[in-house]
Curated annotation (Swiss-Prot):
Potential calcium-dependent cell-adhesion protein. May be involved in the establishment and maintenance of specific neuronal connections in the brain. Residues 32-135, 136-244, 245-352, 353-457, 458-567, 572-685 form the Cadherin domain. Residues 32-693 are extracellular. GO terms for cellular component: plasma membrane. Gene3D superfamilies: Cadherins (2.60.40.60). This is Protocadherin gamma-C3. SUPFAM superfamilies: Cadherin-like (SSF49313). Residues 924-934 have a biased composition (Basic residues). Residues 715-934 are cytoplasmic.
Length: 934
């Protein structure tokens, strides 16, 4: 600031100069001479010869009344009229003359008369480094809590250096320590101030106080400095320090704002209660000089108001530092900065006019598409009338200026209606005044839709499970599909397509609602007819071009118990009579009832029971096998004709059933009848008969030939069957010849007793000893069957047939799991135990496999090709006493018939796999050999 006396002198000088200029305007224009001298020159220091420099005559100076007419500045310089030299007359202190102005100039006015002339002399006072930096206090004390986090800043006292330029204050230095670092900041007026930054957490117990030294350095040569001792006391303070809601506040005030005008209110909060939460506001310690004279701060409310007179030409921006402390015992301070901008009055805001708007805009509009034209006007002049426009950042639009105050709104990025269907653009126009005034207008831009999204679904495929015999027309699936496009492009149409080579499935079985995607069945579905459907749902939208999506729909039909069991044997409507000799012991196998069910799983599991007979105590039936046997010995008092009604029930819910009727004829006990049911241990009386030896020789020769032929056939068939599926293997010759393996399979199926094989049979009407023998030792086709099973599925082979993994062509010992126990084997009098408590198969797969194999053997017997010693369809029994088991083929019965299990479960085959010989296997072989010898 220029001293008031110096300003008054300048004003007086200006008035004199103005008068002289008016008087001498007609004579001669004034001349300006420039000099530069350092400050603090001693009195009498020669500045320059002004007379010579002005071209005046030295001898006429007195006559022309040469004099210095400047006001306050004339005391600093004098002119020697004898020599014309101008010299320093008083101490020149640049800091006193010009303060902090970057340039300091003293102007002198010289006047001569006759004629009147006015001359101006400007002397630039150059700064020298003659002032040390100085701190306003001798020392500084800080109280810092040990809980202060590293990185916290603490403002320090600012030093002041009256010099300017490089001679002014340039930097600060801090003595070395392990806790604090110094950060030197620059104000907007280029002055420096220092902050103390905590780099390492304090520990009051370790160091309760710290002594630091702050040094201020200027840029002169040599550099001058000043030091400020800093005493830091480490305190245990309250938990929470005040916190400003923002670290930087900005305010703008007019330079003619009166005293008391509110500038801004700072706000700090403290989470503590009581005195520790009461905040006191104060100015920071490093504010520039003059801030406290121009502004006032309310200690309680934090309101900053104007106190003095603001001068825009002096300072345009005030940087004020405010600290807040609580009233706790160890208060911690928070600091914020307030920027107060002093501006000239700018009382006209811009005005925005939207001349045209192109809306809606297609979402596929190219970049640079013009959306709107805007014109902006401002009644102010100069910089206050220069206007700029802008749109918020992050939007796909931009403003460009084509002419002055005219702007074009264009697209700058791709539009997406599905993301943002409409924009309300806030266009802001600002002038260049200080403070800048602005205007805001809203431009509404709608985005129109194009068909750029296909129908979408949460699932790419659906698996639907529906129970058979469903209600036609009932919904079975509702497709969840949507299209994010606009309604006109999102109108969906649903169609069903067929997969694979099958056609007609859609029209026969299913339909879909074209509008809502609900799939319905046209007819009741039948599990036994078809179990799975593969469809494709085709969904298209209503846009142009049409976009579509395909969804796979797999429909699985589940089974219901809708089929009652059917009787395979005895044949319904036929006459089946089973022969039973009198005197037969308990447990004798009389016959077997065979049923099947077209359902699957538990719905196809069958159980057998007797409904009624003339003598309830004579017969018993296996619950799961259907085997009918004698429950007690046949007595003479029993009726010669017994009619049995067997109830066959499945395991479904609700259970369905059917009945089968079987007639048993009780015959007189005779030698012929006993010959047909001989005892395994009874000696044969005809061993020495010549006919027996002749037949035996013939059989041995025949067997040798048959074995050779079958060996070749089995080898060829074995090679061919290795690549075939198990279910496609031929089964017509499965039980044609007896043998150990055939014996095991027959017993496993529960069809007959093993003692019905390798026996000598006589017909009831025979009058001579003509034994009928089966062909012993013939090569069994079952070996080829077993090799095929082993190659297709070794695990199933071992479980079902109980065979070892023997080399092809080698018969494994029979699995005793499928044999009857000794007590259950019928002898000559049929002593088999009739109480069969066999277990169910483990799963549906095992059930259906056993059904297919055993029914294949039953079909073999029905064809009349069995060589088990009986007549056509007798399953190996004699023509007189065997059941007439002629089967009728039922479509698909091989896949659905369930023949319940035997006396052993499939899991017992583990002993076979473990390498243990099945119990009773060798005994059966020995018994068979004894029979053949006899």
């Amino acid at each position: 600031m220029v001293p008031e006396a110096w300003r008054s002198g300048l004003v007086s000088t200006g008035r004199v100069v103005g008068v002289l200029l008016l008087l001498g305007a007609l004579n001669k224009a004034s001349t300006v001479i420039h000099y530069e001298i350092p400050e603090e020159r001693e009195k009498g220091f020669a500045v320059g010869n002004v007379v010579a420099n002005l071209g005046l005559d030295l001898g006429s100076l007195s006559a022309r009344r040469f004099r210095v007419v400047s006001g306050a500045s004339r005391r600093f310089f004098e002119v020697n009229r004898e020599t014309g030299e101008m010299f320093v007359n008083d101490r020149l202190d640049r800091e006193e003359l010009c303060g902090t102005l970057p340039s300091c100039t003293v102007t002198l006015e010289l006047v001569v008369e006759n004629p009147l002339e006015l001359f101006s002399v400007e002397v630039v006072i150059q700064d020298i480094n003659d002032n040390n930096p100085a701190f306003p206090t001798q020392e500084m004390k800080l109280e810092i809590s040990e809980a202060v986090a590293p990185g916290t800043r603490f403002p320090l006292e600012s030093a002041h250096d009256p010099d300017v330029g490089s001679n002014s204050l340039q930097t600060y230095e801090l003595s070395r320590n392990e806790y604090f670092a110094l950060r030197v900041q620059t104000r907007e007026d280029s002055t420096k101030y220092a902050e103390l930054v905590l780099e390492r957490a304090l520990d009051r117990e370790r160091e309760p106080s710290l002594q630091l030294v702050l040094t201020a350095l200027d840029g002169g040569t040599p550099a001058l400095s000043a030091s400020l001792p800093i005493h830091i006391k480490v305190l245990d303070a309250n938990d929470n320090a005040p916190v400003f809601n923002q670290s930087l506040y900005r305010a703008r005030v007019l330079e003619d704002a009166p005293s008391g005008t509110r500038v801004v209110q700072v706000l700090a909060t403290d989470l503590d209660e009581g005195p520790n939460g009461e905040i006191i506001y104060s100015f920071g310690s490093h504010n520039r000089a003059g801030v406290r004279e121009l502004f006032a701060l309310d200690l309680v409310t934090g309101m900053l108001t104007i106190k003095g007179r603001l001068d825009f030409e002096d300072t345009k921006l005030h940087e004020i530092y405010i600290q807040a402390k609580d009233k706790g015992a160890n208060p911690e301070g928070a600091h914020c900065k307030v920027l107060v901008e002093v501006v000239d009055v700018n009382d006209n805001a811009p005005e925005i006019t939207v001349t045209s708007v192109y809306s809606p805009v297609p979402e596929d509009a190219p970049l640079g598409t013009v959306i709107a034209l805007l014109s902006v006007t401002d009644l102010d002049a100069g910089e206050n009338g220069l206007v700029t426009c802008e749109v918020p950042p992050g939007l796909p639009f931009s403003l460009t200026s084509s002419l002055k105050n005219y702007f074009t709104l264009k697209t700058s990025a791709d539009l997406d209606r599905e993301t943002v269907p409409e924009y309300n653009l806030s266009i802001t126009a600002r002038d260049a005044g200080t403070p800048s005034l602005s205007a805001l207008t809203i431009v509404r831009v709608q985005v129109s839709d194009i068909n750029d999204n296909p129908p979408q679904s949460s699932q790419s495929s659906y698996d639907v499970y529906i129970e058979e015999n469903n209600l036609p027309g009932a919904p079975i699936l509702n497709l969840s599909v949507w299209d994010p496009d606009a309604p006109q492009n999102a109108r969906l149409s649903f169609f069903l397509l067929e997969q694979g080579a099958e056609t007609g499935l859609v029209g026969r079985y299913f339909t879909i609602n074209r509008d809502n995607g609900i799939v319905s069945s046209l007819v009741p579905l039948d599990y036994e007819d078809r179990r799975e459907f593969e469809l494709t749902a085709h969904i298209s939208d209503g846009g142009t071009p049409v976009l579509a999506t395909n969804i796979s729909v797999n429909i699985f039909v589940t089974d219901r118990n809708d089929n009652a069991p059917q009787v395979l044997y005895p044949r319904p409507g036929g006459s089946s009579v089973e022969m039973l000799p009198r005197g037969t012991s308990a447990g004798h196998l009389v016959s077997r009832v065979v049923g099947w069910d077209a359902d699957a799983g538990h719905n196809a599991w069958l159980s057998y029971s007797l409904l009624g007979s003339p003598n309830q105590s004579l017969f018993a039936i296996g619950l799961h096998t259907g085997q009918i046997s004698t429950a007690r010995p046949v007595q003479d008092t029993d009726s010669p004709r017994q009619t049995l009604t067997v109830l066959i029930k499945d395991n479904g819910e609700p259970s369905l059933s059917t009945t089968a009727t079987l007639t048993v004829s009780v015959t007189e006990d005779s030698p012929e009848a006993r010959a047909e049911f001989p005892s395994g241990s009874a000696p044969r009386e005809q061993n020495k008969n010549l006919t027996f030896y002749l037949l035996l020789s013939l059989i041995l020769v025949s067997v040798g030939f048959v074995v050779t032929v079958f060996g070749v056939i089995i080898f060829k068939v074995y090679k061919w069957k290795q690549s075939r599926d198990l279910y496609r293997a031929p089964v017509s010759s499965l039980y044609r010849t007896p043998g150990p393996s055939l014996h095991a399979d027959a017993v496993r199926g529960g069809l007959m007793s093993p003692h019905l094989y390798h026996q000598v049979y006589l017909t009831t009407d025979s009058r001579r000893s003509d034994p009928l023998l089966k062909k012993p030792g013939a090569a069994s086709p079952l070996a080829s069957r077993q090799n095929t099973l082993r190659s297709c599925d070794p695990v199933f082979y071992r479980q079902v047939l109980g065979a070892e993994s023997a080399p092809p062509g080698q018969q494994a010992p029979p699995n005793t799991d499928w044999r009857f126990s000794q007590a259950q084997r019928p002898g000559t009098s049929g002593s088999q135990n009739g109480d069969d408590t066999g277990t169910w198969p483990n799963n549906q797969f095992d059930t259906e496999m056993l059904q297919a194999m055993i029914l294949a053997s039953a079909s073999e017997a029905a064809d009349g090709s069995s060589t088990l010693g009986g007549g056509a369809g007798t399953m190996g029994l004699s023509a007189r006493y065997g059941p007439q088991f002629t089967l009728q083929h039922v479509p698909d019965y091989r896949q659905n018939v369930y023949i319940p299990g035997s006396n052993a479960t499939l899991t017992n085959a583990a002993g076979k796999r473990d390498g243990k010989a099945p119990a009773g296997g060798n005994g059966n072989k020995k018994k068979s050999g004894k029979k053949e010898k006899k």
